[in-house]
């Protein structure tokens, strides 16, 4: 028990969590997933309740009647069996109940995929902030080294005091930027941990420019999209509801058998009885016709929603695919600019150390590099978001 307690405490915090681990935890711990799983269990019991209307019903009764001393007390025992023989409404209701369970299973799949998308978004948001911290650390190291160089030159009387003050100011800015980046990273970790229902102290991963093979995106969307599957199932259930309403036109037939044993009877054999019942509603004021019409209208409404949703998702998919291509081209351009900015900073630093360039030139080159590297990270982050949207829509 002590070992188990220590093990559970150790699980409360997650260090260096990967994307795969985060996706696994999301599917296990997300509130929406757990609620959907409970709803499936509730619908399983609902099916049992509906199934009871087509199964035999057995009832028994025991009675004792005390009379005066001059009369004989009466003891009675009865048992009855009722078996539906033909009840189309009950069968159609059972189909609807089973369809509802299947619908909830599809909803669970849809919720799971949406949770995966949310995990990806929050994970890559945290990863972006972590990369910002790395950039801030590199920037801080650069200005620390620059300050040491300027202090040496100032002590030797080579550089004026304004250069020293400027170097200290840039170092202070770098420290402040690092603290801000660390705080944003911790906020991103807390947001991810809130979704995963756990404490996360760090994540592990890197931005990758993953390529996915795209065929007929409209076909893949219709075949694989979980949200469309949910809406398609709603149409099926609406059609089943139409059949259920139509089944109410038909009569019901049931058999009833009973046995009664009573001490008041002269012959116990008289206690058996059997009945065959036919129930039919002759006229209900066209209520059933109205119910069928309403059910048909619901089918039309669900069909319209399905077509609108399909068009909406297809438009979103095309936009996301277009974004992937555009961002990929932008990343290639930024990477080239990044190499150029690194070389420009190297040359400016060397020129400054040899007294050819000013510290302002170095400052401008460093700021340009920081801006380009941040732009590259943002582009990689946007690429992952668009990729997550595409995966959500067609996988």
Please report, for each region that a protein language model flagged, where it lies by residue.
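Membrane-embedded beta-strand positions in outer-membrane beta-barrel channels/transporters
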Residues: 78-80, 123, 254, 275-277, ...
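Bacterial Sec-pathway N-terminal export signals of envelope proteins
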Residues: 15-59, 98, 158-161, 196-239, ...
């Amino acid at each position: 028990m002590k070992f188990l307690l220590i093990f559970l405490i150790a699980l409360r915090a997650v260090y260096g969590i990967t994307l795969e681990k985060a996706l696994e935890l999301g599917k296990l711990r997300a509130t929406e997933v757990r609620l959907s799983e409970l709803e499936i269990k509730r619908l399983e019991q609902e099916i049992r309740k509906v199934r009871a209307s087509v199964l035999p019903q057995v009832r028994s009764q025991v009675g004792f009647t005390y009379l005066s001393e001059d009369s004989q007390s009466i003891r009675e025992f009865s048992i009855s069996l009722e078996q539906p023989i033909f009840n189309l409404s009950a069968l159609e209701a059972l189909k609807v109940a089973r369809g509802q369970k299947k619908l909830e299973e599809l909803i669970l799949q849809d919720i799971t995929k949406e949770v995966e998308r949310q995990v990806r978004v929050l994970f890559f948001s945290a990863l972006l902030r972590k990369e910002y911290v790395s950039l801030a650390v590199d920037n801080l190291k650069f200005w620390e080294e620059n300050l040491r160089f300027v202090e040496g030159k100032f002590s030797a009387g080579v550089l004026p005091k304004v250069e020293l003050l400027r170097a200290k100011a840039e170092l202070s800015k770098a420290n402040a930027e690092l603290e801000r980046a660390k705080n944003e990273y911790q906020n991103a970790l807390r947001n991810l941990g809130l979704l995963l229902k756990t404490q996360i102290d760090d994540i592990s991963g890197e931005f990758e420019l993953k390529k996915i093979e795209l065929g007929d995106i409209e076909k893949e969307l219709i075949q694989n999209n979980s949200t469309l599957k949910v809406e398609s199932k709603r149409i099926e259930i609406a059609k089943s509801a139409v059949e259920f309403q139509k089944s109410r036109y038909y009569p019901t037939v049931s058999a009833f058998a009973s046995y009664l044993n009573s001490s008041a009877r002269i012959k116990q054999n008289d206690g058996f009885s059997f009945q065959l019942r036919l129930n039919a509603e002759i006229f209900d004021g066209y209520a059933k016709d109205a119910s069928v019409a309403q059910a048909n209208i619901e089918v039309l409404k669900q069909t319209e929603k399905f077509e609108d949703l399909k068009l909406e998702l297809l438009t979103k998919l095309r936009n996301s695919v277009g974004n992937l291509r555009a961002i990929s081209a932008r990343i290639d351009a930024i990477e080239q600019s990044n190499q150029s900015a690194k070389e420009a900073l190297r040359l400016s630093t060397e020129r400054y150390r040899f007294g050819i360039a000013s510290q302002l030139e170095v400052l401008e080159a460093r700021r340009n590099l920081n801006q380009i590297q941040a732009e590259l990270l943002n582009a990689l982050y946007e690429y992952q978001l668009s990729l997550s949207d595409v995966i959500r829509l067609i996988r």
